[in-house]
């Protein structure tokens, strides 16, 4: 018997050494005393009657699957590949994920490849309800700890050659810890409403929102927006794109505390990033690696918090319209705005116009072009408030800075100018200019 066991053990070792036998170690979920081990339950929408043929209305089947997952205490509602017509609305319960096939956001062609097909692969949700009613019920509602992941959302009845029809918000987030991940919102009228949405996570979202991309307001615990790319993949037809350029706003921030925004980009809007005061308050936050290309105004600050908007490693380009400007700080602003290591280029009228009673700072920034029509406009035009401009490069031989009579304080130190120093100082306040190097 002993010899049999030895020979058996030797045979197993030999099989392992030659790779003929595979051993897998599977760890069970950690059990809690008195309870069964936790499991992740998945609900396939097709098991609840969804067709996925782009013709039959799958709203009821989807909601049945979502409700079943919610009733069970949470789970994943899986959407296989297909085109799903949703003629109604969807509500994702607490602790439920509505998940398609995408593990990263798809980006459909448009700006550089007009001929490629529009959404007809992966998981596609076709939305038809709410046409003509921007204030209607949102397409998808998320609540506490619920998630939308891995889908493309498309509005097939929107005409890419005409000014857009209004629709309700595509995604509405309410409550704590909801998420939108790995999603393409191809042609929504308004994409994501994140009001009263504490600790939300919006990550890896692509698309071409027409009127508004993301609205944040009434967020008292830190929200996060990461890797969002709004680009005209769906249409650059003249009537539609002109409308978007004259009406569209990509990112709008009202009251939000300690917001974190990372690696975001938008192209082709009236305003790229807008900071406003609502009845709930104003924004303060950290904005790193953000960009706005071909926006009439890249950043508009109507109001900000006294502890500030901290904008670092930004890239901003404006060139269309009658008065293309990268930064516009309104006379209503009383807060602080700081730009660090940002770059500004494109044939614009001016880099920045600054009003209000707040403080605006530019540190280690690069200003490549301005005064495109040779009107003698300065790159940075400060009309009132306080300004700090330090360690920046002005790469065009043109007026660099103008200070109006209502400027209270200004520090312009340690900059480099192409051509002679041209700083127009009409301020009656305290102004310090020095240690600048002209070519």
State the predicted function of each range.
Residues 80, 87, 93, 99-101, ...:
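Feature marks extracellular polysaccharide-active and adherence modules
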